[in-house]
């Protein structure tokens, strides 16, 4: 003690009392390396693991830290906690040594000769990092020759990650695998139903899936009891009527016994086809297309005089970042409205000439079925409408306001596919056109617009409850606007861009501002402004982002072909793939489309090439 006092040096001045923390980056690595050196030299090891009459020395502390199995063994009063040697059952020396080596070195070498042993041991000892490494290794090894074995392995060890990967593999190769003897003999009814019910299953057309189902059912007599369970995953309404009666029904009758009751699915599909107009409200899981939703634009007024109004309906091909024509409208339209109900695209009203002041307003309603790529004309609206809003809510459409040859409208009417008719409901409190609207939790919201009176556009926000047939005022926007866009994303309603008139000069100017409304708080908040003007543009929410398509600038009197994309998380606008033409008065929507046969074949070929097969 005296010596230590003599070693101290007196301070000529005071040292700061502030503290600083120092970090040794390689500390944990060094500790692990030293522990491994001790283990290899037999130093301080306090337990010996015994398996297959071979010994693996280790440190209890490290085993307990890395393994829930050993932690329970050494801390819950089991007899192994006091034994020098602990014998393990249900594992192998190869697996145990590799896993213990990993705990000390953080390195794991996997190959075809040891993967089974290591996975078995890691699962027993509950060392989930090693289990994940094994899954990652096996995922790279999945092939048409071993996927069934690996699927069984995933089932034995409850490896959800590997099981999901193999399911994805089967879905991507279903047209090849589903007719192989191994698949037909081995795949369980549970797995078959998962594959047949998926929207991602590889197939050229629905008949391929029906054949796979019938082949599986007829492999073994005892599978007859699963007929309804399997066939309920085949989307019979997607077959045309002639195919249903001539091929589908014939195939089922020839392969299945009459008591299997397979014909009920054909009858259900025929009822669907015979109820043509009501199909949007007859949707079940069997009427849905097996495809992802696409972003589309419909019609509009193009800037090139020679083109005038457009009849294009195009979707965005994300792989090639270009717009591809899906179909042509039955009639050219601009400043119309589009809504999707039951997977059908409805196009209502709009102008049939470049003079869209209301004199050329239409009351026609067309419906597009992406399943059959077919347009039909259904019941017309009671009033001609242009510059209005069309909502899809529950099992009906709602047309709100607008204008026609008689001026601005306050009327609101609903369309029922069940009756193929329009019915007036509670009207707006005032004449309104050039407004925007959206749906939020089964309520219709509209904002802004004009009423032909002299003065600027409105700030008001209205909410319609179709259950009570009542319109109510909500907190107005911070910015007056018309010809703008509205949409719902997450828990907010967005009011986007548009234009307004100066109070003094009545000159039109562009509004680039964007604001978000919270229905819960009844409050507006400004968010990032648009990159450029967007009056009379199309709007849709797709894959968690807002898309603004085309539009018009009143200040530069120019049409736009720009696509503006809003990322809510980043609160930022960016540019998407340009439209084929500069266009305004366009509508947009999101809907699942039925790829053409040649597109499906190309997609299946691309999948095989991507996997090097």
Swiss-Prot record:
Residues 147-249 form the BACK domain. Coiled coil: none annotated. GO terms for molecular function: cullin family protein binding. GO terms for biological process: protein ubiquitination. Pathway: Protein modification; protein ubiquitination. It comes from the Eukaryota. InterPro entries: BACK, Beta-prop_ATRN-MKLN-like, BTB-kelch_protein, BTB/POZ_dom, Kelch-typ_b-propeller, Kelch_1, SKP1/BTB/POZ_sf. Kelch repeats lie at residues 294-343, 344-395, 396-442, 444-491, 492-544, 545-593. The keyword Repeat applies. Keywords: Kelch repeat, Repeat, Ubl conjugation pathway. PROSITE patterns: BTB. Residues 45-112 form the BTB domain. Interacts with CUL3. Probable substrate-specific adapter of an E3 ubiquitin-protein ligase complex which mediates the ubiquitination and subsequent proteasomal degradation of target proteins. This is Kelch-like protein 36. The gene is Klhl36.
